[in-house]
Amino acid sequence: MNNLLILLVMSLGYSQCDADGNGDLDVVDVVIQMNCILTNCWYVEVEEDVIHYDDYVYQTIVINDVHWMAENLRTTHYNNGDDIINIEWDEGWTYNYEPACADYDESEANTAIYGKLYNQFAVDDDRGFCPIGWHVASDSEYSELANYLGGVDIAGYKMKNSDTLDGSNQSNFNGLAGGCRDSGPANGDCCMGNLGQFWTSNSMVYAELESNKDALAFNTKDKRAGKSVRCIED
């Protein structure tokens, strides 16, 4: 097997992927990738890419040849320039059935870290609020991501931010514990620091990261609920 590896490295020459992230394409990158093939591992291609959108610069990440936002969405506009209505909890969020967004605990400081919370009506709106050429990730796209990271039972740990959700963030997904806004009249904003919940493009389905669990979970919720959003390139 060792001889086979040596022959493969010699025949391949220089790698086309910077597997060790040092900025150089060399034999070391080939060895890393060959070892990855033999051990059925995975790696993340980190690119120095950003998206300038609605007066904010988003970090992005490539995982399994798919371009994801590495931050939660925070836009307040649709692609045509229309405003997404911001509704505070005591202004009737529970009884609203129109597209809307919110700041957790009505705090712009929270939004600066965790992004906005959106209801499903905003996600479903035909005007779209991801950058042009991007869309809200579907449940199947989250599932494909999880499978690439080793399966839903362990993917959450690799997706979670190490500061806010006790994960390893090996994937560089940077999943944040942005909490949620419940649709019930008695509950309000909940679980910042413990839960990261992300609407999918599938109606009422969201992906969930939890601080004390390694899995990526999928659940359903009333469309009035407020959750984070991640965009993915078309």
Model-derived regions, located:
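Conserved positions within compact, well-structured domain cores
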Residues: Y43-D234
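Alpha-helical transmembrane segments and their juxtamembrane interfaces
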Residues: L12-G13, I32, F129
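Sec-dependent N-terminal signal peptides
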Residues: N2-G13
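Hydrophobic side chains within alpha-helical segments
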Residues: I6, D29-I32, A122, E144
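Alpha-helical segments with a strong preference for the paired helices of cellulosomal dockerin domains
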Residues: A19-Y43
